[in-house]
């Protein structure tokens, strides 16, 4: 990996981000709308899974270059997008919550091909449910883990407040719970 201090980003992820930010939206571009919403006192949170997470990081970096300071990025199973110089330049300017499922290979996929790219150093590692048979990168696994964490925290908070919390007895379901794949239909104008 080159250590010359020049910021480098993955060309494919950068092209995708450029295309997204240049897309028309309400008489402006998506980038202009996001930039207008990203200035203090507002906080702008960008999030994504896999490629969407890579784009969220690069979009936040571009918005930071335009003066936005209230940026938060939450990625789920995102690949590395830049080199060490990129990470040093933006690591303090955007609040990044990098979430990775234990065993998710996408986190290190880009580094396996090129040593130019590095992940931001901090990350939160989630464990899949013990009964899951999903591929570690599957978005449904991330959604399941997020919901489990939410309800665990909610239950702890309700208990702390002294509220009655229904006890499920810790019994496993008679059959596994199936989460259907997420899908959406986009308007053809998009």
Feature map (PLM): residue ranges:
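Serine hydrolase/lipase
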Residues: 2-47, 57, 61-190
């Amino acid at each position: 990996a080159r250590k010359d201090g020049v910021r480098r980003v993955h060309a494919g992820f950068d092209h995708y981000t450029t295309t997204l930010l240049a897309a028309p939206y309400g008489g402006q571009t998506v980038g202009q709308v996001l930039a207008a919403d990203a200035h203090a006192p507002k906080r702008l949170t960008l999030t994504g899974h896999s490629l969407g997470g890579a784009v969220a990081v690069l979009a936040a970096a571009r918005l930071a270059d335009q003066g936005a300071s209230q940026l938060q990025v939450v990625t789920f199973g995102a690949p590395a997008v830049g080199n060490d110089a990129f990470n040093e330049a933006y690591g303090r300017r955007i609040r990044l919550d990098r979430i990775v499922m234990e065993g998710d290979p996408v986190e290190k996929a880009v580094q396996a091909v090129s040593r130019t790219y590095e992940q931001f150093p901090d990350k939160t590692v989630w464990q899949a449910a013990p009964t899951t048979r999903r591929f570690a990168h599957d978005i449904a696994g991330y959604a399941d883990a997020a919901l489990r964490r939410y309800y665990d925290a909610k239950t702890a908070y309700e208990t702390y407040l002294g509220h009655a919390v229904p006890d499920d007895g810790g019994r496993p379901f008679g059959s596994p719970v199936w989460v259907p794949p997420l899908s959406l239909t986009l308007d053809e104008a998009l």
